[in-house]
Amino acid sequence: MIRVLLLPILIALIACQCRKNKNNNCTNPSDMIIGVDLSTYPEIVEDHGIYFNDQDEEINLLQFLHDKGINTVRLKLWHSPANEHASLTEVTTFSNELKEYGFKIWLDFHYSDYWADPADQTLPNAWAVCNYELLMDSIYNYTHHVLSKINPDYVQVGNEINHGFVHPFGHINQVEQFKALIDTACKAVRNYNNQIEIMLHYAGHEGAVQFFNHFQSVDYDLIGLSYYPKWHGKSLDSLDINMNSLHEMYGKDIVIAETAYPFTLDWNDQTHNVIGLEEQLILPDFPATAQGQYDFLEEIKRISTNQHDGNYGFCYWGGEMIAWKGNQALDGSSWENLALFDFQSKALPVIDAFCISQDD
């Protein structure tokens, strides 16, 4: 009789232990970057956006992400933006909050007042009157000043600088000036704190070996690559090969600095989505489903955390960008179908792909 009574208790204890194991926090290797870019999060919080776990319980997003093994947060910085978002004030405040949760800070200098990418590298308005020599001084002093406020763990000097930065002076067509301006920014970082790791960031992987040849005399630590199948090709094998070639050629650790994948091609507001067509996907391996998104990031993780090949980690871009302004917003999220949370702001399975298991 006692055995019969004890059996349900034993089953309950086993079930509890299974749930406990499933919900255990993940601690990833500290010498890898397992990151998310949360640059839009302060704006979302300001507009009262909220998030839920897969049990429909409201969560503290920062604690939740940390518990899932994410150890680094990437933040973009604009020089003099039109509002407070991505400003030095906002980024300083947010980075201090992130440090309280134990995150490392990856600071992404755009050296512009707005988005910098291969198509647009506009000089900040404050530097519009500069000649080349004065621009060198401005970049050095600005970089040093920002670091005195934030003191990050990683500094990205420029964003997707395939064609240069701070145009026209730093255009790749004037490669010696471009290289000298990058070198000036890197020296500002080294002279402030030589423990900060410096990254140079290239969009894609095709042509990257030739691009980084320009910077063999520059003192930096990491090569960052953006990888989105829409723009950078649908062959993950080619990505893997080119990352290995970069490491072998230049001896730098390689990071996938930006990536993302859709869990659906539907929309949750009235704002045009950047990714919305099947032709932009890697099919049939990775459909726009929750499972397809998970499988894609698992493969990115496999490629980017193989430290034998000099690979150092990855960062998911826009994971927080739910349709936080409501489903009628014309100025809402262009990325809600690539977020880490579904259209009810509930955590998707992909969130568990950030944890590096013993088998990875």
Identify the function of each model-found stretch.
Residues 4-13:
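Sec-dependent N-terminal signal peptides
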Residues 34-38, 73-75, 105-109, 153-157, ...:
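Hydrophobic faces of well-ordered beta-strands that scaffold small-molecule active sites
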Residues 48-66, 136-146, 206-216, 296-300:
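Short, acidic/polar
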